[in-house]
């Protein structure tokens, strides 16, 4: 049986930096998708680091919905990410969207926003390297 391919879409400046916006990969989590894209592009994590310096954060959508997280946790900490849907394996994962958001755009009360640095640390913390 062939593994189902998940559509991962990088938006805006992130897609421009990587040189590609849509990826179709056999992954079961956001962390696995990020690691796979970085391994193939050699640019994703360095783009996260550069964009962090430019105050760009990310809205992550899983299956076209903002990811779920424990609102009592600071999402930009390892514990916060571990308690979120970002850390889960998904049986029905169909799509992941990574959307850059300029810090100060006042989305933090509406959407779950996370820094690129935290996304990288999250991949390391889950033993994905």
PLM features per residue range, with description:
Residues 1-104:
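Terminal export/targeting leaders at protein ends
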Residues 105-109:
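Juxtamembrane/start-of-transmembrane alpha-helix segments at the extracytoplasmic/lumenal side
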Residues 110-129:
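Membrane-active amphipathic alpha-helices enriched in small hydrophobic residues
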């Amino acid at each position: 049986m062939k593994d189902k391919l998940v559509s991962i879409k990088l938006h805006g400046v992130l897609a421009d930096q990587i040189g590609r916006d849509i990826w179709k990969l056999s992954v079961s989590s956001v962390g696995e998708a990020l690691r796979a894209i970085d391994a193939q592009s050699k640019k994703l994590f360095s783009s996260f680091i550069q964009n962090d310096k430019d105050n760009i954060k990310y809205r992550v959508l899983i299956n076209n919905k903002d990811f779920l997280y424990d609102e009592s946790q600071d999402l930009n900490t390892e514990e916060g990410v571990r308690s979120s849907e970002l850390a889960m394996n998904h049986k029905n994962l169909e799509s992941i969207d990574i959307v850059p958001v300029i810090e100060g755009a006042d989305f933090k009360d509406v959407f779950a926003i996370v820094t690129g640095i935290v996304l990288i640390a999250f991949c390391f913390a889950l033993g994905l390297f």
